Amino acid sequence: MLTQLTINNFAIVRQLDIELAKGMSVITGETGAGKSIAIDALGLCFGQRVETSMVREGQERAEICATFQLESQNPAYHWLSEQELQDPDNPTECILRRIINADGRSKAFINSTPVSASQLKEIAQYLVHINGQHASQLLLKNDYQLQLVDNFAAHPELLVKMREDYQTWKNLQNQVKTFQQKVAENEARKQLLQYQVDELDEFNLRPNEYLELEDEQRRLSSSEQLTQLSQSALQILSENDTVNIDSLLYRATQYIDELAELDPQYAEVQNMLNDALIQVQEATSEVQNLSSNIEQDPQLLQEIEQRISQTLQLARKHQVKPEDLVEQHKKLKAELTALLDFSESEEMLIEQEKRAFEQMQATATALTASRQQSATRLAQNVTQSIKQLAMENAEFYVELNTDLDKVSANGADNVIFTLRSNLGQQPQPLAKIASGGELSRISLAIQVLTSDQSAIPTLIFDEVDVGISGKTASVVGKLLRQLSERCQVLCVTHLPQVACHGHHQFNVEKFTVDNKTETKMTALSQAERVPALARLLGGSEITELALANAQEMLDLVH
């Protein structure tokens, strides 16, 4: 709960330091005295936006500090631990501090550690809930009505799961859209690839085939020339009857043999010529073999030349060298396979998106069931409360409209608060039928009921009793006091019938010092509360009757 609030140089507050206790604390004062200024300052500790006008005129900076005492089961206690912001010497204490400079810059601290404004907002949701004087106007908005039903239902885990399931589905839906867009963009490419791959598959060029075809084509196209050249070579080597290398070498070896017998120095020459003769004879035999295998097949040559021509044509089409066409075929196949796999991935993603949507609908259905149950109870409880607030013939209803085909992060429900003000009338939406006073009373009843379901330790009601008076105001005070038995209640009010129900009372006064306006807030003793209430009852002049009435009001409550 909030135990201390210190304010320095904020607006018309020069210095303020108040201590707060359990139960119901009321803040009272004359109209225009600045009763809500402490609540406004407290809002800065919860991360609200700063303005330069917030700094007291003539001062360099304003500073607001709020001290909370936490119980170990409070989510704020665990949040501080997770964020490593706990005071190791006093882990159950949480001090929020905000400094605003005159130039508009600000600093935020939690337990003396610098933090961001968003971190202040995050922890604030576990510490305080402020019910403002404009809540009755918010009551006309369907989104706010849904929020109130959820607050009363007290199913935060279900709301978190709803948001998570919705986000999961939304992410998958976006992925599907992206995939489908890419698939559409790739369709033309896929069709072209399929045609190209089919064409190359049918052509079926083997690795190195083109080079082999070139060699074979050269051989076949030169067969006549090869035959002629081979015959000419054979003539010179051995087949010319007049003169040939074989016979000449043979005759030479005979002469050298005789020389070697006469002179051993010719032995080496003898060996060389014998080797040469063997080489010539082997070469002759090889040429004879090769020439006998020379093909002259015009049809085969035509087929090979046609295959080469087709290869060159395909290579030009794909803008590669003929010898690289096989590798190009592999690349195109790989790209086509990737696009086909991409289409399969899209189908898998669509199936995932479908399952996520079904899961989201299931969570939305569970959320609807919880809301329907709490909506019935809320309507009954609000009806009971507003009857106590001088709306004896009124009936309050909560209509829940569900469309599982239009699920959002908040579920599939649309809430409408309706009211039957008088007997014999049909219920109508609040915006069409409720007066300002009725809205204030309904709003207050709902705020008390929904706050009662909350685990937040401190509830602030900032002039929520606008538009009511007399006996109705007394009932409001009683409701707030009952609520303070379960949590700390801070109430800004101008009604004595509400103020008298407080366990503690603070009075706000506005005065002038050195031509500068200041506001101060003072904690009142029980004795001091009597004239303060009397002033609320009778204005600036406090009569004996007003004092007696004020004392009686306090006696009846306490």
Curated annotation (Swiss-Prot):
Organism ancestry: Bacteria, Pseudomonadati, Pseudomonadota, Gammaproteobacteria, Pasteurellales
- Which parts of the sequence bind ATP? 29-36
SUPFAM superfamilies according to UniProt:
P-loop containing nucleoside triphosphate hydrolases (SSF52540)
Q: Quote the InterPro entries the UniProt record gives.
A: DNA_recomb/repair_RecN, P-loop_NTPase, Rad50/SbcC_AAA
Q: Tell me which family the UniProt entry assigns to this protein.
A: Belongs to the RecN family.
Is RNA-binding set as a keyword in this record? no
GO molecular-function terms, A-Z: ATP binding; ATP hydrolysis activity
What UniProt keywords are attached to this protein's entry?
A: ATP-binding, DNA damage, DNA repair, Nucleotide-binding
Domain of life according to the entry: Bacteria
Please state what the protein is called: DNA repair protein RecN
Its function?
May be involved in recombinational repair of damaged DNA.
Q: Where is the signal peptide?
A: none
Q: Which GO terms describe its biological process?
A: DNA recombination; double-strand break repair; SOS response
Gene Ontology cellular-component annotations: bacterial nucleoid
Organism encoding this protein: Haemophilus influenzae (strain ATCC 51907 / DSM 11121 / KW20 / Rd)
Entry keyword annotation includes Ion transport: no
